[in-house]
């Protein structure tokens, strides 16, 4: 079975968020999450984001999604 996973470029994601002046809470709210830990776990690579979340993050940060996330195919 082929599985696609998103690999997070944690350093670039954190840098872009900080440059825009957003907190973890701001990012989580934008994603519709109740806890700021939701975004923190994505940013630190502890949790793989859903495709929709990755797209929302890149939209808010006004950067191409490929700056922060790469798709890796596993077989």
Protein language model annotation of sequence segments:
Residues 21-41:
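Short alpha-helical DNA-recognition segment
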Residues 1-19:
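A short, Lys/Arg-rich alpha-helix, primarily the initiator
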Residues 17, 28-29, 58:
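The alpha-helix within a helix-turn-helix
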Residues 37-41, 52, 70:
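Base-recognition residues in the alpha-helical recognition helix of bacterial helix-turn-helix
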Residues 61-75:
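Short C-terminal boundary/hinge segments that cap the last helix of small helical domains
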Residues 14, 25, 55:
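Residues within the helices of the helix-turn-helix
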Residues 21, 45-58, 74:
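Short, basic-rich loop-to-helix N-cap that marks the start of a DNA-contacting helix
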